[in-house]
Design a protein with these regions (language model features):
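Class I S-adenosyl-L-methionine-dependent methyltransferase catalytic core
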Residues: 1-175
């Protein structure tokens, strides 16, 4: 929607056909624009429909491995993977992002950490390292406070010996 309102071309990718349908419906509004918006079902491990060095900005919000599953059995859905498998797939995402991004342009990734067996697993920083290993440089690390999380009420009522994870990172990388 923002790309259409700002008269910018955009490509939107999601693995879940329901999300694609929602996006297509949300784009049905009228405004004065010449933008071209392409919504495609798929995942970002294979962007073969985009030529090298054609994208000015990438913004992504991947799942946090298998913490919340976005489908039951969609092939290629990385929300169904273990942390190790997720990071392997994110390595492919980082490679493809690097390939399609123009030199000097930015890629923003919003992701947070997770908790496993009472310990914090720094998934955000692991994903950051994946992108750095693929050649990106770190431009900014933004800490975004989370509000109204689905599980906050549940965890606040439990007898815990740990703090709630109440933030996400927005890592801004430059090619």
């Amino acid at each position: 929607m923002e790309a259409k309102l700002l008269n910018r071309n955009a490509v939107g990718i999601d693995i879940n056909p329901q999300s694609i349908s929602i996006s297509e419906k949300n784009l049905q509004f009228q405004c004065e624009t010449t933008s071209k918006i392409r919504i495609q079902q798929g995942n970002s491990t294979n962007l073969n429909f985009v030529k090298d060095g054609r994208i000015d900005f990438i913004c992504m919000h991947p799942p946090y491995a298998n913490i919340i599953k976005y489908s039951k059995d969609i092939l290629g859905d990385i929300s169904l993977l273990s942390v190790e498998e997720f990071l392997c797939e994110m390595s492919k995402v980082a490679s493809e992002s690097y390939r399609v991004l123009k030199k000097g342009k930015m890629c923003a990734v919003m992701i947070g950490d997770i908790r496993r067996r009472g310990k914090v697993l720094p998934l955000g920083f692991q994903v950051m390292n994946v992108f750095l290993e693929k050649g990106f440089s770190s431009k900014e690390i933004i800490i975004k406070e989370q509000h109204n999380c689905r599980s906050t009420d549940y965890w606040e009522k439990q007898n815990n010996d740990f703090l709630l994870l109440s933030h996400e990172y927005i890592f801004v990388f430059q090619k």
